[in-house]
């Protein structure tokens, strides 16, 4: 089976008229079948790419268990589900890793919005059961809300990878969550209406593979129902799609001109340059928002750190006073 891949190493213009081709097929899609864009976000090493492979049903995204991210650009593959909808899975690099520059992140967010032509039908936050919740992950939800607005949580699904760990320990996800669940995670699950799925991306059991993907698709369908069938879009996404439509329209007009091929090529080059310039401007806008969000997160972290230090100092002072009082009482007893 072949698959439809699109990577964005530069500003590429998606074709609105291009048919779905080379799709990883369970059955042939018809032109009327809808596309559901599912974007995977999360920390490097949490298993985003492996989860994408599980959804698609074969290894299409490069995936390795290592600290350094394998995915360096947004990539997308499509699969046709047995029930009809085409699932367009968008794998992202570690957009919320602290070591990644704001410039890189902003460009990849714009690339992600380019790939999600119809809008976002689900945002999958990938967390690993094998690691503690990191500061990056705690910042991720705030960053998503700052970049896209509070409505983004209406499209959020949490996927927990390393499901085999639960099986090895004879635990359920509920057991895991009830055993000292971090406040951040409680908040995320509350905001997204408890939409969560456990993925075992290493399993060879075809039944388990199918079941976990089906559970995810049930959540995607529930989001569609709850949002009235409207995918998530924001001002930035609409501007990107309007720009794409403009370029396609002008490209068609150039093709219809009765001029030499060399002139057509020159006009198309100018059009491509204007598109790239506009995409760069949008990336700069996104970078500014991201930097402001990162600065706000850092201020909050520093405030929490200061509060903890004050609490520690206060506790130390209280303990010291208690020890001094105890010593005084002891001395009084000795005198008596």
UniProtKB/Swiss-Prot annotation:
**AIG1-type G domain span:** 33-241
Region of interest: G3: 91-94
Provide the alphabetized UniProt keywords. Answer: Coiled coil, GTP-binding, Nucleotide-binding
Please give the Gene Ontology molecular function terms for this protein: GTP binding
**Parts forming coiled coils:** 237-270
The entry's GTP-binding residues are 42-50, 63, 201
G5 as annotated region, ranges = 200-202
Q: What induces it?
A: Up-regulated by brassinolides. Down-regulated by 2-aminoethoxyvinylglycine (AVG), high CO(2), isoxaben, and propiconazole treatments.
- The record's region (G4) falls at 161-164
Q: Which PANTHER family match?
A: AIG1-LIKE PROTEIN_ 48352-49494-RELATED, GTPASE, IMAP FAMILY MEMBER-RELATED
Q: Which family does it belong to?
A: Belongs to the TRAFAC class TrmE-Era-EngA-EngB-Septin-like GTPase superfamily. AIG1/Toc34/Toc159-like paraseptin GTPase family. IAN subfamily.
The molecule here is called: Immune-associated nucleotide-binding protein 6
Q: Which organism is it from?
A: Arabidopsis thaliana (Mouse-ear cress)
């Amino acid at each position: 089976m072949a698959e439809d891949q699109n990577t964005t190493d530069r500003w590429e213009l998606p074709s609105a008229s291009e048919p779905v081709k080379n799709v990883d097929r369970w059955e042939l899609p018809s032109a009327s079948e809808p596309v559901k864009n599912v974007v995977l976000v999360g920390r490097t090493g949490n298993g985003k790419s492996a989860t994408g492979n599980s959804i698609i049903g074969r290894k299409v995204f490069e995936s390795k268990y290592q600290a350094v991210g394998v995915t360096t650009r947004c990539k997308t593959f499509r699969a046709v589900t047995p029930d009809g909808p085409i699932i367009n899975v968008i794998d992202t690099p570690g957009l919320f890793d602290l070591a990644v520059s704001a410039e890189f992140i902003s460009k990849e967010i714009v690339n992600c919005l380019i790939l999600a032509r119809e809008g976002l039908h689900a945002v999958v936050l990938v967390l690993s059961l094998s690691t503690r919740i990191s500061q990056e992950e705690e910042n991720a939800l705030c960053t998503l809300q700052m970049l896209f607005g509070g409505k983004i949580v209406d499209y959020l699904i949490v996927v927990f990878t390393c499901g085999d760990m639960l099986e090895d320990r004879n635990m359920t996800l509920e057991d895991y969550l009830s055993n000292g669940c971090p406040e951040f995670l409680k908040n995320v699950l509350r905001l997204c209406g408890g939409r969560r799925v456990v993925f075992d991306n290493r399993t060879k059991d075809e039944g388990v593979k199918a079941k976990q993907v089906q559970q995810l698709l049930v959540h995607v369908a529930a989001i569609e129902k709850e949002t009235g069938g409207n995918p998530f879009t924001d001002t930035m996404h609409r501007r990107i799609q309007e720009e794409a439509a403009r370029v396609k329209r002008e490209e068609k007009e150039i093709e219809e001109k009765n001029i030499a091929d060399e002139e057509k090529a020159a006009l198309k080059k100018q059009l491509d340059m204007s598109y790239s310039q506009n995409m760069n401007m949008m990336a700069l806008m996104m970078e500014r928002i991201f930097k402001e969000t990162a600065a706000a997160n850092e201020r909050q972290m520093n405030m929490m750190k200061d509060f903890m230090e004050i609490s520690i100092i206060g506790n130390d002072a209280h303990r010291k006073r208690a020890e001094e009082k105890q010593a005084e009482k002891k001395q009084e007893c000795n005198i008596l």
